[in-house]
UniProtKB/Swiss-Prot annotation:
Name of encoding gene: EEF1AKMT4
Record PTM Phosphotyrosine, positions in chain: Y39
CDD domains per the UniProt record, alphabetical: AdoMet_MTases
GO molecular function terms listed in the Swiss-Prot or TrEMBL record: methyltransferase activity; protein-lysine N-methyltransferase activity
Enzyme class: transferase
PANTHER family tied to this protein: EEF1A LYSINE METHYLTRANSFERASE 4, SAM-DEPENDENT METHYLTRANSFERASE SUPERFAMILY PROTEIN
Taxonomic path: Eukaryota, Metazoa, Chordata, Craniata, Vertebrata
Catalysed reactions listed for this entry: L-lysyl-[protein] + S-adenosyl-L-methionine = N(6)-methyl-L-lysyl-[protein] + S-adenosyl-L-homocysteine + H(+); N(6)-methyl-L-lysyl-[protein] + S-adenosyl-L-methionine = N(6),N(6)-dimethyl-L-lysyl-[protein] + S-adenosyl-L-homocysteine + H(+); N(6),N(6)-dimethyl-L-lysyl-[protein] + S-adenosyl-L-methionine = N(6),N(6),N(6)-trimethyl-L-lysyl-[protein] + S-adenosyl-L-homocysteine + H(+)
Keywords for the protein's UniProt record, in alphabetical order: Methyltransferase, Phosphoprotein, S-adenosyl-L-methionine, Transferase
Tagged with keyword Translocase: no
An example Gene Ontology biological process: methylation
Catalytic activity, EC: 2.1.1.-
Protein name as annotated: EEF1A lysine methyltransferase 4
Summary of the function given for this chain in its UniProt record: Protein-lysine methyltransferase that efficiently catalyzes three successive methylations on 'Lys-36' in eukaryotic translation elongation factor 1 alpha (EEF1A1 or EEF1A2).
């Protein structure tokens, strides 16, 4: 498929962008998910396979955050990486995915909040998220200046990711957020990881971030991370379109 955006018909949207953070919205959205086509934010597995597979090992214990009804976990299994645990805080979609992939016993599905993972420290070799952090940040009014609440929410998730990773474990984030928006979140020394960035997609670029626990951030990356609550402002344009809080933030990436 073309790596342009969601792969299925757009479901009913929340009244406001901040609704993407509410479990009630996702529970309602995923009613009937067991029988519906997978919905893929930022492209399906084939779009970023060449970037992802070199970072995986056949015996890796892999955790997928905010799985939704994406086929990603199953595609990873088919790629030769069988040990995949997927979590979402919508119990509705977790039940649907358990039913859909009941024939694959090494795929596990758990209802869980990504800000408070119920796994022991050092449980996974790889943690992967695709669009989950984007959804948590959709309520932000200004992408250049994330609120202290937004920074705290992302920090909660990333602290948990670092905790459940083994030494030398990898965290992989797939997102629409370019480095000038996302690096400052990932480039924090207390997570104890390094940071690399790549892009993928045809026409519209998406972003692939790789963090490896036990390696260090560069001086330049640490400097960007230090700006987390006071990032540089973008140039003021001579004219602009007024954003609406009713705009479908996630679907707006489609071409």
């Amino acid at each position: 498929m073309a790596c342009l955006g969601p792969s299925a018909q757009v479901p009913e949207l929340p009244e406001k962008n901040c609704g993407y953070r509410e479990v009630q919205y996702w529970d309602q959205r995923y009613q009937g998910a067991a029988d519906s086509a997978p919905y893929e934010w930022f492209g399906d597995f084939s779009c970023f396979r060449d970037l992802l597979e070199p970072e995986l090992r056949p015996l890796d214990r892999i955790l997928v955050l905010g799985c939704g009804n994406s086929a990603l976990s199953y595609e990873i299994f088919l790629g030769g990486f069988p040990d995949v645990t997927s979590v979402d805080y919508s119990s509705v979609v977790v039940a649907a995915m358990r039913a859909r992939y009941a024939h694959v016993p090494t795929l596990r599905w758990e209802t869980m909040d990504v800000r408070a993972l119920g796994f022991p420290s050092g449980s996974f070799d790889v943690v992967l998220e695709k669009g989950t952090l984007d959804a948590l940040l959709t309520g932000e009014q200004d992408p250049w200046t994330v609120s202290s609440e937004g920074v705290h929410t992302v920090d909660q998730v990333l602290n948990e990711v670092s905790r459940v990773l083994v030494p030398a474990g990898r965290f992989i984030s797939l997102t629409s957020a370019a480095p000038h928006f996302r690096t400052r979140h990932y480039a924090q020394a207390h997570y104890g990881w390094s940071l690399r960035h790549a892009t993928y997609g045809n026409g519209f670029q998406f972003h692939f971030y790789l963090m490896q626990k036990g390696k260090e951030l560069s001086v330049a990356q640490l400097a960007v991370g230090a700006q987390i609550l006071s990032p540089p402002r973008p140039p003021t344009p001579s004219c602009f379109l007024q954003d609406s809080d009713h705009e479908d933030f996630l679907s707006a990436i489609q071409l």
